[in-house]
């Protein structure tokens, strides 16, 4: 039996997303806040993305830092998000954080639900 090392594919945190997180953190006046991205069961395609601000980081969380702010992902969610890009977009449909996920085989029209 052999042991193989596993290096997870990075999660990309775009400058647009980092800038928006920084703006929101500054508005709250709490520099301990981090953007937590997670995956839960549900939505029209089986899984859905969620975003929240969190002060706490668990020992097994993945942390991605850019421009002085942090994005945090728990290990269960990371397996679905490895290689994905977290971005922030503004357009006619409004403004929101979006995930471009190469692991998703299908996504719903709103972009917040996916299947593998």
From Swiss-Prot:
Keywords: Iron, Iron-sulfur, Metal-binding
Domain of life where this protein originates: Bacteria
Family matches, as InterPro entries: FeS_biogenesis (IPR000361), FeS_cluster_insertion (IPR016092), FeS_cluster_insertion_CS (IPR017870), FeS_cluster_insertion_RrpA (IPR023063), HesB-like_dom_sf (IPR035903)
Binding site for iron-sulfur cluster: 44, 108, 110
GO term, biological process aspect, one: iron-sulfur cluster assembly
PROSITE patterns for the chain: HESB
Pfam families in UniProt: Fe-S_biosyn (PF01521)
Cofactors demanded by this protein: iron-sulfur cluster
Gene Ontology terms: cellular component: cytosol
Cofactor: record remark: Binds 1 iron-sulfur cluster per subunit.
rRNA-binding found in the keyword field: no
UniProt GO MF annotations: 2 iron, 2 sulfur cluster binding; 4 iron, 4 sulfur cluster binding; iron ion binding
Iron recorded as keyword: yes
Function: Required for insertion of 4Fe-4S clusters for at least IspG.
Family to which this protein belongs: Belongs to the HesB/IscA family.
NCBIfam families referenced in this protein's UniProt entry, alphabetically: iron-sulfur cluster assembly accessory protein, PRK13623.1
Binding partners and assembly: Homodimer.
Name of the protein this chain belongs to: Iron-sulfur cluster insertion protein ErpA
Organism: Pseudomonas syringae pv. tomato (strain ATCC BAA-871 / DC3000)
């Amino acid at each position: 039996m052999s042991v193989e090392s596993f290096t997870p594919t990075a999660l990309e945190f775009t400058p647009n997303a980092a800038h928006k997180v920084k703006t929101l953190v500054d508005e709250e006046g709490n520099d301990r806040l981090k953007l937590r991205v997670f995956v839960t069961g549900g939505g029209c395609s089986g899984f859905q993305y969620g975003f929240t601000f969190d002060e706490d980081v668990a020992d097994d969380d993945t942390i991605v830092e850019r421009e002085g702010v942090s994005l945090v992902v728990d290990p269960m969610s990371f397996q679905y998000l490895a290689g994905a890009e977290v971005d922030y977009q503004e357009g006619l449909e409004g403004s929101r954080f979006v995930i471009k996920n190469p692991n998703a085989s299908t996504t719903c029209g709103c972009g917040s639900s996916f299947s593998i």
